[in-house]
């Protein structure tokens, strides 16, 4: 019905195969899906992935975009909308400060790590995108796509869409994760582009 033409991968990205992009023929819209490497095992590569992804999308401002994937970020979202990245640390009193895993401190500062994650997770608006789940559910919904061993929900999987969108529904389907098909719950997003 609407064939998709592949878009050349970002060769400067550490793992270019972790970003797949296509242009929908007969429509002025691109679809991008990514799997950002986890920082715990890849360190600065995660930061570089975010930086290259943002740069790639920022250079494509003339076309509407949908961006999906496993971003392995953020660490935490508060009900106020505040985002805590993996470049930050939260003290027992709740105070937030810039920090980075000591394992990676020689490769990447906490400031750079924080900025790289925010470039997409928080500053997606600069790319003409909205966070479909948050637009539909606000910040009081603390659903997640991945859970720690202590049961803490983390919202690592996202769908960002163009601003001219009518969102019908968006939720994390916990059943596939509970049935052990994946360690992540898929994000369901149904919407119309106006």
Predicted ranges, named:
Residues 1-2, 22-27, 161-163, 182, ...:
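Active-site beta-strand termini and strand-to-loop segments that position acidic
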Residues 1-41:
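Structured beta-strand-rich core segments of catalytic domains in phosphoester-bond hydrolases
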Residues 16-21, 153-158, 182-188:
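Short hydrophobic/aromatic beta-strand or adjacent loop that forms the aromatic wall/cage
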Residues 36, 70-71, 185:
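Active-site metal-binding loops of divalent metal-dependent hydrolases
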Residues 146-150, 176-181:
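Short proline/glycine-enriched turn/loop segments at secondary-structure junctions
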Residues 166-177, 186:
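Low-complexity, intrinsically disordered Gly/Pro/Thr-rich segments
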């Amino acid at each position: 019905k609407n064939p998709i033409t592949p878009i050349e991968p970002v060769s400067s990205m550490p793992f270019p195969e972790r970003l797949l992009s296509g242009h929908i023929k007969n429509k002025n819209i691109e679809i991008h899906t990514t799997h950002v490497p986890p920082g715990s095992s890849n360190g600065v590569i995660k930061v570089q992935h975010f930086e290259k992804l943002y740069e790639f999308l920022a250079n494509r401002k003339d076309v509407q975009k949908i961006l999906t994937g496993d971003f392995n970020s953020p660490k935490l979202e508060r009900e106020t909308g505040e985002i805590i990245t993996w470049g930050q640390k939260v003290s027992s009193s709740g105070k937030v400060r810039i920090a980075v895993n000591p394992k990676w401190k020689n490769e990447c500062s906490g400031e750079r790590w924080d900025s790289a994650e925010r470039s997409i997770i928080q500053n997606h608006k600069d790319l003409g995108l909205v966070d479909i789940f948050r637009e539909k559910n606000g910040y009081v919904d603390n659903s997640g796509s991945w859970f720690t061993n202590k049961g803490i929900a983390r919202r690592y999987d996202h769908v960002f869409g163009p601003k001219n969108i009518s969102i019908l529904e968006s939720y994390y389907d916990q059943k596939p994760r509970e049935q052990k098909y994946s360690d992540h719950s898929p994000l369901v997003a149904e919407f119309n582009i106006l």
